[in-house]
Amino acid sequence: MREETPEQPAPLRSGYTTGSCATATSLAAARLLLGGTISDAVQIVLPKGQQVLMRLEFCRAWENGAEAGTLKDAGDDPDVTHGALVFARVRLGAEPGVRFHAGPGVGTVTRPGLTLAVGEPAINPVPRQMIERHLAQLAAERGYAGGFEVAIGVEGGAELALKTMNPRLGILGGLSILGTSGIVRPFSCSAYIASIHQGIDVARANGVRHIAACTGNASEDAMRRRYGLPEIALIEMGDFAGAVLKHLRKAPVEKLSLCGGFGKISKLAGGHLDLHSRHSSIDLPQLAGWAAALGASTALQDSMRAANTSQQALAQAHAEGVALGDAVCAHALRFARGIVPTEVALEVFAIDRQGNLVGQACEERR
């Protein structure tokens, strides 16, 4: 029998953004157009100066131009685009500079509020700058005075985009080409937080005055039922309550409704901005203490401290007529109020696993 040894977890592997993929493929295709040879890899420089060699799946002539493709490698990050083919189709243009186009699988901006104008292909500013810089250097090396027409595409991007926030943000037809550093850090969650900020910005730019930030589908459904809010007003915050609350400091709305499962809201009430179990946990003694302030018996408090889950503690409290759900929401509102500007009206709702409302706290405003 093989002797057991302690597991030594391997370090998580970083990957490359779609912006890096778009840069590498644009450079390879443009180089071929300007007399270069077909190669199976291309070197690019990332925004912070790192040089990386990216493998190409193909680099070939295409219609009146050239095209190149690479497989997106997200490393150990759970990225929806991992393994997708990102490609660039490049033609020479008469005017200097780069004109960008949305190829198959890349979306187009249809709503104001993003960093790109309505009608623009969803190729974000930093990837655009990376492509422009590399093609300008190539043109200078080859003595080429014209410009480039660059279309970026992602195979299957239209279908993959349905798994992202793009449809809600008004980016239609495909994915966005993203990245600020060129590198995907495993579990950094930066893209998700950026999508939360974009969701708020798009809602504001389209005249939405009341948004609901929700931890999941059940809480979104609860807010739809209560207010009939349009999709653009529903912000899928997941575990990142802090991303919503802090962004409202510089991008306020008239009213914010926070809604989530009772356990998530109890974490917010306890002063946590990241509601994921990796970063915060349910504080059952704290729940028992709040129940005590509402007149809970000593026996109930002891029972709540020994509960297996927050839902069990909530059920125990409600069985004795202790309005723990409302109290937790009130504590969460008080904590959030310390972050959000006073001009933003706040309310907090908690739901159970069936989506039923189990607590609420709403500010009264004259």
From Swiss-Prot:
Gene Ontology MF annotations? cobalt-precorrin-5B C1-methyltransferase activity
Q: Which InterPro entries match?
A: CbiD, CbiD_sf
Q: Which UniProt keywords apply?
A: Cobalamin biosynthesis, Methyltransferase, S-adenosyl-L-methionine, Transferase
What are the BP-aspect GO terms?
anaerobic cobalamin biosynthetic process; methylation
EC id: 2.1.1.195
**Per its UniProt entry, what is the enzyme's top EC class, as one word?**
transferase
S-adenosyl-L-methionine in keyword set: yes
Annotated catalysed reactions = Co-precorrin-5B + S-adenosyl-L-methionine = Co-precorrin-6A + S-adenosyl-L-homocysteine
**Any single Pfam family the record assigns to this protein:** CbiD
- Which pathway, per its entry? Cofactor biosynthesis; adenosylcobalamin biosynthesis; cob(II)yrinate a,c-diamide from sirohydrochlorin (anaerobic route): step 6/10
Asked if the Swiss-Prot or TrEMBL record annotates the protein with the keyword Endoplasmic reticulum, the reply is: no
From what superkingdom does this record's organism come?
A: Bacteria
Q: Which HAMAP family match?
A: CbiD
Q: Which family does it belong to?
A: Belongs to the CbiD family.
- Stated name of the protein: Cobalt-precorrin-5B C(1)-methyltransferase
Give the lineage. Answer: Bacteria, Pseudomonadati, Pseudomonadota, Gammaproteobacteria, Pseudomonadales
Its gene name is cbiD
